[in-house]
Amino acid sequence: MKKICLILLVSAFTTPLFSQQLAVINFLSPRFETPNFLWIGTTYDFGKIKVNRPVTHEFRFTNSGDAPLVISSVQASCGCTVTDYSRDPIGPGSEGYVKATYNAAKAGVFSKTITVNANAAESVVQLTIKGEVVE
């Protein structure tokens, strides 16, 4: 009699467990919204330029991600390069820019970098301007 009561008691508690559905969570491919840079070019060659004549190039990009892209800072490698950039959030599919103006004080070959920090998948991007300054 004890065995029958024990079997009935165990089956009374385990039957509801088998009737519940399990929640399946996919941990392998989480979906996060992220902004992403799609640059038209990351290097620009000015060629030959004159001393003390500023030259400017505008690097353009598209936010190919699915969240707003925000540039937090843009820094040039030296004081001879002044930068400007899109300061408002760039929505998915929209375009933005980083502008670099270089003013050479002496003749010679140059190569300068502009570092872009943003909330994109590639959070730090290096842009390069180069050329040759002639008298």
Report each predicted region and the residues it spans.
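Asparagine-centered strand-capping/turn motif at beta-strand->loop junctions
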Residues: 61-65
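Short, solvent-exposed loop/linker segments at beta-strand-coil boundaries, enriched for Pro/Gly
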Residues: 77-84
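Beta-sheet-dominated interaction scaffolds and their linkers
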Residues: 24-60, 135
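Short, solvent-exposed loop/turn segments enriched in Ser/Thr/Gly
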Residues: 52-58, 105-113
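Short, hydrophobic/aromatic beta-strand segments
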Residues: 67-74, 126-128
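Terminal connector regions
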Residues: 108-135
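Sec-dependent N-terminal signal peptides
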Residues: 4-13
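Positively charged n-region of N-terminal signal peptides that target proteins for export
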Residues: 1-4, 20
